[in-house]
Amino acid sequence: MKCQSIITTACLVGTAFAQAKLKIMPLGDSITEITCWRAKLWDLLKANGVTDNIEFVGSQTNNPQNCQASDANWDKHHEGHSGFLAINIANTLLEGWLASAQPDVVMFMLGTNDVAQGRSLTDIMAAYTRMVDLMRASNPNMKIIVDSVIPLPMNNAPIEALNAAIPPWAAEQNTTESPVYFNDVYPYPSTALRDGVHPNDAGDVIIAGALDPLLTWVIRSSTAAGNSTSS
């Protein structure tokens, strides 16, 4: 009986390991929460044959735009929160979200609300750095994808300054153990906005299409290295 118990336990452990998936957190504000690029991205990832190896994670599963993917079972988990600032996420919220979801990969677009509320570029970049520190404290091997921020026609100069600052910042933050990747969603015309802030369908296509090659590569390289990297 003891032998049978040991064999059963070993089988259960082996099955759990085999089924482990790379955990990817889509992090952001309303541009992550109430738009459809995540559904479109999932379809692109499925076409690339990698969705069996991943799961999106986060405390949210809402779908206010009733976004539809070709895959009816697309993973709706995310950490997008309308109206939230990068500064507030970094200072008070992200640590708990990371502890709950335990992602291996975080991809984020943040800063629109900070700019809209007059926060300085220095403060926004400090929040970015704080977020990276928290991600690495959660998982020393965290893979981090930072998007450029889509246009804000009502006040675009600070967005342009933020987008110019992200690539050199990402290069400074990058490490072998925990790489930081800059993902440029431009060219992104203002006609790809539905209300001057959020992407319309064309904008969702742009964001998903920009993320797809990089995220697919991250997924394949991470799973080839031994499946998920979280403890």
Give each language-model segment a name.
Residues 1-19:
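Fungal secretory targeting signals
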Residues 23-26, 31-126, 155-160, 164:
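Conserved SGNH/GDSL esterase-like catalytic core that processes O-acyl groups on lipids
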Residues 26-27, 194-231:
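Histidine-centered active-site loop/cap adjacent to the catalytic His
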Residues 32, 36, 42, 46-50, ...:
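Sec-exported extracytoplasmic/periplasmic mature domains
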Residues 49-60, 142, 146-148, 182-183, ...:
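Surface-exposed patches in mature extracellular/periplasmic domains of secreted proteins
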Residues 103, 140-141:
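Proline-centered flexible-loop/turn and helix-kink motifs
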Residues 132, 142, 149-184, 201-205:
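Substrate-gating cap/lid alpha-helix
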